[in-house]
Amino acid sequence: MSRNAESTAYRSALEVISAVEPRVADAIRSELTDQRESLKLIASENYASPATLLAMGNWFSDKYAEGTIGRRFYAGCQNVDTIEALAAEHARELFGATHAYVQPHSGIDANLVAFWAVLADRVESPTLERARARHVNDLTEADWFALRRELGNQRMLGMSLDAGGHLTHGFRPNISGKMFDQRSYGTDPETGLIDYDQVAEAAREFRPLILVAGYSAYPRKVNFRIMREIADSVGATFMVDMAHFAGLVAGKVFTGDFDPVPHAHIVTSTTHKSLRGPRGGLVLCGPELAEQVDRGCPMVLGGPLPHVMAAKAVALAEARRPDFADYAERIVANAQALADGLLRRGAKLVTGGTDNHLALIDVTGYGLTGRQAEQALLDSGIVTNRNAVPQDPNGAWYTSGIRVGTPALTTRGLGTAELEATAELIHTVLSLTSPGANADGTPSKAKYVLDPAVADRVNKQASELLAGFPLYPAIDLG
């Protein structure tokens, strides 16, 4: 493909957009500039390929396609069937799964499909069988009332938020917390690692319908074989949310006991993050849950986004190429180089390092809250996000941690030497930032003091570091 093709495509697109609403075109240009000039260390972000991005910008956006392949509620969906089948095929082959459902719009949608598939299989289907009914519409009002009550009285066991779990795993602010009676397992207070004996004890005491594994801020591998054994011991369905580390599974960095697909009853994921695709979700499962999962529409979804499924097909095809395995290995090598560099400079990391794509810095050692550290780094051209640490004294808003991840910088081509240099920049900013005060003189958890000259100097150093690794080098918007 000609390098000029990508520039031509985006220049032409922006010209068309500018003719209608130039401010949108300006924002698109500004976003590219911002992404090119910032050290992006947000663990959940990446850079999708131009092919993936372009696959979303077409007339598939105009189609309704409620239903599944060959069974739509609308006519004229043959081309949607084609791209959905391609995306599902690539997902099955990439992850070694029996069944793939690629319609979810996001990770939470994928989780909701999985939750309701399990509820339908474990709760709804037995009720229908007892009532000798084929469909919920055939139930009497009394049976329907009883089923609704039973569906709302199920239990879920997942990782606690401050240990690195995710809001969508049954926590009260999220809809999943209103669906399930949820309990959490944590990590060892000394090591920060999952204590599988403690998980087993919690499962025995709580007897959940669903045991969830997966994380958004846990910097180590999870032994899914052990987790499946725990689930089996209490009759729970074992679900894994691999949204954060799907790229490491796809790239065969996580194998054996650390690959969730052979061990879980059902697996969910996003298609962005370390998988480097469009924003969206997917569900993987075996034949026993496939029929229920395919009822995601209308059970949870109003219908798929065909243009995003087209982009999923492209991104999943890219992930099946041999060079993706090298990319996945470099993500982890870069994360470990960043973590090691921070440790050598005296930073405190949760669990003392990383086995995956992220590290979690406890910034209380610098005398800061996560919010103060996040903003000071942003002022200096380093984009991160604040995150709670285990037993966090500052809560989920101000936090005591900063989460850093390497998928995006690895996509740009940065290596271990550059991540070592990034550790120095982070340490410099955090060491030279101090807490600020409120107007009444009381200590602030949000305000901070950083010499603008330091921020400018680090910004310049970050720009110099990125100069050799241009983002979307084939795209010149003029």
UniProtKB/Swiss-Prot annotation:
<keyword id="KW-0554">One-carbon metabolism</keyword>
<comment type="function">
    <text>Catalyzes the reversible interconversion of serine and glycine with tetrahydrofolate (THF) serving as the one-carbon carrier. This reaction serves as the major source of one-carbon groups required for the biosynthesis of purines, thymidylate, methionine, and other important biomolecules. Also exhibits THF-independent aldolase activity toward beta-hydroxyamino acids, producing glycine and aldehydes, via a retro-aldol mechanism.</text>
</comment>
<comment type="pathway">
    <text>Amino-acid biosynthesis; glycine biosynthesis; glycine from L-serine: step 1/1.</text>
</comment>
<dbReference type="Pfam" id="PF00464">
    <property type="entry name" value="SHMT"/>
</dbReference>
<dbReference type="GO" id="GO:0030170">
    <property type="term" value="F:pyridoxal phosphate binding"/>
</dbReference>
<comment type="subunit">
    <text>Homodimer.</text>
</comment>
<dbReference type="GO" id="GO:0035999">
    <property type="term" value="P:tetrahydrofolate interconversion"/>
</dbReference>
<dbReference type="InterPro" id="IPR049943">
    <property type="entry name" value="Ser_HO-MeTrfase-like"/>
</dbReference>
<keyword id="KW-0028">Amino-acid biosynthesis</keyword>
<comment type="similarity">
    <text>Belongs to the SHMT family.</text>
</comment>
<dbReference type="InterPro" id="IPR015422">
    <property type="entry name" value="PyrdxlP-dep_Trfase_small"/>
</dbReference>
<feature type="modified residue" description="N6-(pyridoxal phosphate)lysine">
    <location>
        <position position="273"/>
    </location>
</feature>
<keyword id="KW-0663">Pyridoxal phosphate</keyword>
<dbReference type="GO" id="GO:0005829">
    <property type="term" value="C:cytosol"/>
</dbReference>
<comment type="pathway">
    <text>One-carbon metabolism; tetrahydrofolate interconversion.</text>
</comment>
<keyword id="KW-0808">Transferase</keyword>
<dbReference type="InterPro" id="IPR039429">
    <property type="entry name" value="SHMT-like_dom"/>
</dbReference>
<feature type="binding site">
    <location>
        <position position="161"/>
    </location>
    <ligand>
        <name>(6S)-5,6,7,8-tetrahydrofolate</name>
    </ligand>
</feature>
<dbReference type="GO" id="GO:0004372">
    <property type="term" value="F:glycine hydroxymethyltransferase activity"/>
</dbReference>
<feature type="binding site">
    <location>
        <position position="291"/>
    </location>
    <ligand>
        <name>(6S)-5,6,7,8-tetrahydrofolate</name>
    </ligand>
</feature>
<feature type="binding site">
    <location>
        <begin position="165"/>
        <end position="167"/>
    </location>
    <ligand>
        <name>(6S)-5,6,7,8-tetrahydrofolate</name>
    </ligand>
</feature>
<feature type="site" description="Plays an important role in substrate specificity">
    <location>
        <position position="272"/>
    </location>
</feature>
<dbReference type="InterPro" id="IPR001085">
    <property type="entry name" value="Ser_HO-MeTrfase"/>
</dbReference>
<dbReference type="InterPro" id="IPR015424">
    <property type="entry name" value="PyrdxlP-dep_Trfase"/>
</dbReference>
<dbReference type="GO" id="GO:0019264">
    <property type="term" value="P:glycine biosynthetic process from serine"/>
</dbReference>
<keyword id="KW-0963">Cytoplasm</keyword>
<protein>
    <recommendedName>
        <fullName>Serine hydroxymethyltransferase</fullName>
        <ecNumber>2.1.2.1</ecNumber>
    </recommendedName>
</protein>
<dbReference type="InterPro" id="IPR019798">
    <property type="entry name" value="Ser_HO-MeTrfase_PLP_BS"/>
</dbReference>
<dbReference type="InterPro" id="IPR015421">
    <property type="entry name" value="PyrdxlP-dep_Trfase_major"/>
</dbReference>
